[in-house]
Amino acid sequence: ITDKDAAKSIKRNNPFNVEKGENWQGLVKSDSNRFFATDTPLNGLRAGYINILAKLKRGKTLGETIEILSPKSDNNPTSAMITLAENMSEVDKNDKLEVSMDNFEKIKQFGLGLLKFEAPNHNYPDSLINEAVKLAIEQKTGVKSKAVVKDKSKMYPPPKTFKKTSEVEIKKGGKKFGALATPKRA
């Protein structure tokens, strides 16, 4: 993927370059006929992880999943993607990966391996990736888990409804929330 294409996927909040076709959460108008756009990075990351998990749930191996998502016919460095995802997730390319919270870290690392190619030179906060993985696993398993990101001020980018407030103002309110206070409507 070129730097120009990667920048477009980031602008679309679709860093995994998931193709149109599903009614994804947070869809907005896209500048592409092939790839959708979402309203937030979280919704785009969530969709990308759901797309990965859908292939894994069908019994595909790590290698087969990447070959489907990033085929060589699209001029993708599929072999290099498989090797990196294999190394990062510590899952062999010929192994299947069960979709469950028990495999949270492996699933997360598998996706991060793909993102190194799909969205090079762009790093999302760990808290955002964790929330996207959690939501995707919940979606595919139907099992709710404890929240990974409880503090919405750590979202990326921070919600526009948050107003920076000094520590003194926060302490006066009786609750300390760090650099961000409770949401205030603009």
Model regions and ranges:
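Cell-wall polysaccharide-cleaving catalytic domain and substrate-binding groove, primarily
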Residues: 1-186
